[in-house]
Curated annotation (Swiss-Prot):
Record's keyword terms, sorted: ATP-binding, Hydrolase, Nucleotide-binding
Protein name from the UniProt record: Nucleoside-triphosphatase THEP1
Catalytic activity: a ribonucleoside 5'-triphosphate + H2O = a ribonucleoside 5'-diphosphate + phosphate + H(+)
HAMAP family: NTPase_1
List of residues binding ATP: 11-18, 100-107
Enzyme Commission number(s) of this protein: 3.6.1.15
Biological source species: Sulfurisphaera tokodaii (strain DSM 16993 / JCM 10545 / NBRC 100140 / 7)
InterPro entries assigned: Nuc-triphosphatase_THEP1 (IPR004948), P-loop_NTPase (IPR027417)
Amino acid sequence: MQTRLRVYITGEPGVGKTTIFLKVIDKLKSQGYSISGFYCPEVREKGQRIGFKIKSLDNEVEDWLASIYAKSSIKIGKYYITINEDIINKIKEKISKSEIIGIDEIGPMELSVPKLKEIIDYVLNEKPIVVAVVHRKISFKDGKTFVVTYENRNRLDNEIFNYIISSIQ
């Protein structure tokens, strides 16, 4: 598989970007593609967001990415970056072995962690096929960007999946 394909998913907060991303990843896995990467779900406590986890797409690796409770030298908004370097190394190892890479999200928080930014740069520069959720204020010149809205979110996963399949076959 020598195709170079970049698919970006963006939209306003809470519109369903992660849901669509995970549906697309699941559909690709069901077709037998080797996929790895990570996603960063929010963590809520009593209805309030208290931070973010980082999880490998196979859910074998998980840890805190950022929290309002932890203290560290890197702070984005109200969140302190707390990621463990061992977690980053495990995710990087998984990524090196896969043909399709999924990332949710490429945003200010993820890019503020030097080792995580290294992985993102490596993936974008070296891996043939990337599907990534991108913060609404970040854009890339290469690839195709899909904007999630309340109007299209119930069908966009199929549109993205079909675009990827038609582009790599």
